């Protein structure tokens, strides 16, 4: 909690610097959402966050882009604070550019908040302390935990969620096991 204000300011500043546009360009940080229905779903979640008392710190609108990108389903990344960890916004899988910032006092408190959701696809732990990174990653109910990174993984490594975030694993030997249908044939002696 002691670093929350400084972290919030730095995080919002970084989000506001993100370049939205053509995902084929190296300079682009965020491309379009997959469809109009997807963008509409994320915008409904933005309305829910407002209704739950969230304070919008940045984003939440459709960016004005060049003519060749106007038909895309773009949405600026949104950052909220002032939302409780157990509100709908923080308990559902949104799959869109929406983040909420929540202060915490210790590891036990933040693990309780993070593990309260019925989902557990992926998580990210950011720290300079290796031992803390290990404790937190082991304590998180998530199928994949990144440490000091996001969206980086070896495609040979198993990937999949826990709880309501999926069944089975993709990637590596775990995927072969998941898609293998064993059959036992028994003959009498």
Stretch-by-stretch model annotation:
Residues 19, 67-70, 74-189:
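Conserved C-terminal structural/oligomerization subdomain of aldehyde/semialdehyde dehydrogenase
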């Amino acid at each position: 909690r002691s670093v929350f204000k400084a972290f919030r300011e730095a995080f919002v500043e970084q989000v506001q610097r993100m370049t939205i546009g053509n995902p084929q360009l190296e300079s682009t940080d965020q491309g379009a959402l997959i469809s109009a229905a997807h963008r509409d779903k994320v915008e409904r979640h933005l309305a829910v966050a407002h209704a739950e008392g969230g304070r919008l710190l940045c984003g939440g609108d459709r960016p004005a882009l060049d003519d060749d990108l106007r038909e895309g389903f773009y949405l600026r990344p949104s950052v909220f604070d002032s939302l409780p960890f157990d509100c709908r916004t923080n308990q559902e899988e949104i799959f869109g550019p929406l983040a909420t910032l929540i202060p915490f006092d210790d590891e036990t408190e933040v693990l309780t908040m993070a593990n309260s959701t019925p989902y557990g696809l992926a998580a990210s732990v950011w720290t300079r302390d290796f031992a803390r990174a290990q404790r937190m990653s082991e304590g998180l109910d998530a199928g994949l935990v990144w440490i000091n990174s996001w969206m980086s993984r070896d495609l040979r490594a198993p990937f999949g969620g826990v709880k309501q975030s999926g069944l089975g694993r993709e990637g590596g030997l775990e995927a072969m096991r998941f898609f293998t249908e064993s059959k036992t044939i028994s003959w009498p002696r």
